[in-house]
Amino acid sequence: MKMKYQAFNKELLSMVCVAAFTFSANSFAAVDVDAAKSLARENSCFKCHGTDKDKDGPAYTKVAAKYRGKADAEAKLIHHITSGEKAKFPDGHEEDHKNIQGKASPEEIKNLVDWILSL
């Protein structure tokens, strides 16, 4: 009887692990890449940022690398693109960063930031 109980527990544990992995993977797959790129185009983000190539601003892959593993990464990037704070350019001058607050919903902004961080 004890052997059947142990086998059942192992099988149940395996199913729970598979379910947990499946649901956690789905949360990472929630980024709508097309919507993120569309929002970036609509707000002229690609004028200064390339996906993987520097322009006047850093490439999004570099932004992702800079913030990778940091707990406050999403909040910092959302603040940066919604506050109009200063952006530093390669030649040393500073300008107000384009502010997309009011031009997109909070969910669209979060999706854009999540896409950038996924690169």
Describe the residue ranges of each PLM region.
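Axial heme c-ligation environment in periplasmic c-type cytochrome domains
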Residues: 56-67, 80-110
